[in-house]
Amino acid sequence: MSDSVDKKFEEEWKIEINEWIESLEAVKESYGNKEVKELLRSLQNFALSQGITLTEATLNTPYRNTIPLSEQPSYPGNHELEDKIENIIRWNAMAMVLQAYDTGEGLGGHIATYASAATMTEVALNHFIKSRTENYQGDMMNIQAHASPGIYSRAFLEGRLTKDEIGNFRRELQDAGGLPSYPHPRRRPELWPSPSASMGLNGVNSIYYARFAKYLENRGLLKKSPGKIWAFLGDGEMDEPETIGTINIASREQLDNVIFVVNCNLQRLDGPVRGNGKIIQELEAVFRGSGWNVIKVIWGSEWDPLFAIDTNDVMQRRMDEVVDGEYQNYSVSSGADQRAHWIQDNKELESIMSNLSDDELKDIKRGGFDRKKLYAAFEKAVNSKGKPTVVLIKTLKGYGLGEGSEGRNIAHQKKTMSDEERIEIGDRLGIPLSDQEKKDAAFYVPDEKSEEMQYLHDRRKELGGYQPIRFDSCKSIKAPDIELFEDFTNGIDRSISTTLVLVRMISKMLREDEIGQYIVPIVPDEARTFGM
């Protein structure tokens, strides 16, 4: 076809698409969302009956936020105070690792992970994750292990950890005490509910905790309203077979009490997670295919006016085309370079993007740093019924650490900084320390009567208490006397099946007054084969 014929077809096809969209809008206004879904299903089924296979249309939604602006609730928090608190926690988390490195003992830690996860963690802790109360069982918060400095930093502000303890990060045996690198209840039994440092352990642990909690709930064994299990994970961590391999259990058991929050900063320990792909889209397909509720938080509020004028979806198509490696390159490129690569030769897209200056384009936020978008996602997650929820949040590794770290492949291994970097970051975060104190990575705590500290404590008080926390108020159980097993300890004069002995021992323990009521035999299929 000639160029003129091509152009005519393009214009006619655009009109055709717009007419279909207008028709769909009319159906929505007249009948509602449910009927729109039914109509689309019918159209898809008809296409399939005609031999047209829609391979890409079933498990992926466009590369944009799941919750549209029209359905976004208002944010209940104080942005100014939450900014200040988050910045203080960011500073102290970074200072903790820098002080450990400055000892010259070869110690380090992870700075960049919490830098990317700080905003989502703070929104969750200020507004959603509840502690145990008289009528509520309490939520469980299992964190992304490399983000532990941020949790320690918050606990320090809350008064749950001392200055000596956080000053001895990775040096637990110091006389004044110290802190372990990663979460484990054996190391800090009052803080960490579950170990999460081994890659893949956090997800599977959280699912099985949620399953057990649902077991207790379904049998009326909980005296309080059941809580949620929150698992904060990294996108690289999602490649672990233990994580993905257990998600079907959560959907099959209808575990609407588990929420996965995946920090998609697009980088793993040693480079990109999916340089030539899109990890968020990949995970969306995996989780939707497994029956999970999927919520994506990709773009910040600055994009909303651009979506409003993107009537022909040219910007959306570009968002869908660009791969993670290119998005990461944008994070280390100037606004002008981003614009040139993003627009290419598309005049309509150029017109849309002209609403942003190069500086605005450079500084535009990913969804993981927008409290409004995060709040909307978490609110929908906690109200999900009948199925588990995963929230896929796009962030930037090393966010706020300056051009030497943000989005760069070396960000994960960043353990130290120059004096100039420390001062520059402290200034940007608004930390009121002297330049020398910033060089020394000194900790900062506001006055206990300050607005920031009052807000910090009030928010946790409103949610029942501090988190994360491990509840260990369990009844002590007396072990049965050895006489209970004398049939086995005395021995017999013939060989006997170990399976038979096991069954008899369990039977005796089930009849024992002290412990019998706490034993729950879980019988696998093989039990029938073995005569159990």
Predicted segments — roles?
Residues 77-89, 93-105, 110-253, 276-277, ...:
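Cofactor-binding active-site loop characterized by glycine-rich and histidine/acidic residues
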